[in-house]
Regions:
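Transmembrane beta-strands of outer-membrane beta-barrel proteins
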Residues: 29-33, 72-80, 124-128, 163-167, ...
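Repeated loop/turn-to-beta-strand initiation elements of outer-membrane beta-barrel proteins
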Residues: 68-71, 121-124, 159-164, 191-193, ...
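Outer-membrane beta-barrel translocator/channel fold
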Residues: 83-97, 198-294
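Short glycine/proline- and aromatic-enriched beta-strand/turn motifs that initiate or cap beta-hairpins
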Residues: 26-87, 196, 303
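Transmembrane beta-strands of outer-membrane beta-barrel pores
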Residues: 35-41, 80-88, 130-136, 169-173, ...
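Outer-membrane beta-barrel "beta-signal"
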Residues: 182-185, 288-313
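Residue-level signature of outer-membrane beta-barrel architecture
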Residues: 61-67, 116, 155, 186-188, ...
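Hydrophobic, lipid-facing positions within transmembrane beta-strands of outer-membrane proteins
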Residues: 55-61, 106-112, 128-132, 145-151, ...
Length: 313
């Protein structure tokens, strides 16, 4: 209890006097641990036989840094993240018998997020994210390094409504692409709409005691990962893996004591992609069919840490 109070006081001191740069959007996750399970499904490609399932888990820690001069108010968010993707496949690389194969991929990133106040109602939200994405089965190379970035310009119309437009360069579709972004937020004491397209669309309702939030969530995420060793279920020599999924389903957040939240979601994983690119740039499609999923996570989110959602995706 003493440790939690000390942490809370530190974050509060970072944000006192910066109300012009803090956009009342959503609670900011200082610490987040999450996992998701996707059972095996048949491969969609007609020429391939087998099933593929996934298990994801990750952790992130964010540290705020407040900067204020006589003219400008700036909030920096330093976030370190680790993600782990397990690919569990049963397939035949040739015309022979089925082969069971597990492969683990890792994603380590540092995200520098910035909220800069142009005027009292206009803000610029910037994210810069150098990333290491690899199977870590050989020494790191230049191919293991990625760079992702996004910029949003956000208008706060009033305490409830916010909207914005921007551009991102990221791997959410399983490939490195430039992607236009749109933001729309509406929040009252009983309902919260949080839309950052194409990243997420959340519609959550709040119980009268504010201890339970429930509703629907949709989220798109993906990565491009360097592959350095043999994949037993594929005969080609694979150089790179592209993975993405869109999850849609009901969600519930239980607000626990001392600013901790328990987050649960289930539903369907759709619009999935699993592509293996070999050394000759041929694409081997092993995308599985739509699948149910279940996700669970825990987060630490003090009430006063309410930062623009473009920094908290």
């Amino acid at each position: 209890m003493l440790i939690v109070n000390s942490i809370f006081k530190y974050y509060l001191s970072c944000f006192l006097g910066l109300s012009s740069a803090v956009l009342l959007a959503q609670e900011f996750d200082v610490v987040q641990i999450q996992s998701a399970y996707y059972p095996k499904q048949f491969i969609e490609e007609s020429g391939a036989e087998g099933e593929i399932g996934f298990f994801e888990w990750g952790v992130q820690v964010a540290i705020p840094q407040a900067i204020k001069s006589s003219k400008d108010s700036i909030i920096l968010i330093h976030r370190m993240s680790y993600g782990n993707l397990k690919v569990d496949a049963e397939a035949n690389p040739t015309a022979g018998p089925m082969v069971d194969a597990e492969k683990y991929y890792h994603n380590i990133s540092y995200n520098l997020g910035l909220v800069y106040s142009l005027k009292s109602t206009w803000h610029v939200v910037v994210n810069l994210t150098p990333t290491i994405a690899s199977d870590f089965e050989e020494k790191l190379r230049g191919d293991d390094l990625l760079f992702q970035a996004s910029t949003l310009i956000v208008k706060s119309k009033n305490k409830s409504w916010k909207y914005g437009l921007g551009l991102a360069y990221n791997t959410r579709f399983g490939r490195q692409l430039f992607i236009p972004m749109g933001l729309l937020k509406y929040e009252t004491k009983r309902v919260a709409l949080d839309m950052v397209l194409p990243n997420k669309l959340n519609l959550m309702f709040k119980a009268s005691n504010n201890k339970i939030h429930y509703g629907l969530k949709a989220g798109l995420n993906g990565t491009v990962i360097n592959n350095s060793t043999e994949i037993q279920s594929i005969s080609n020599v694979i150089d790179e893996v592209g993975y993405s999924r869109l999850i849609v389903g009901p969600a519930i957040t239980l607000r626990l004591k001392n600013a901790f939240n328990l987050n649960l979601q289930g539903g369907l994983a759709v619009a999935r992609r699993l592509e293996f690119i070999d050394v000759n740039n041929n694409i081997i499609d092993r995308t599985p069919q739509a699948s149910p999923f279940f996700a669970i996570g825990i987060s630490f989110a003090p009430n006063l840490m309410r930062i623009e959602s473009g920094l908290n995706d």
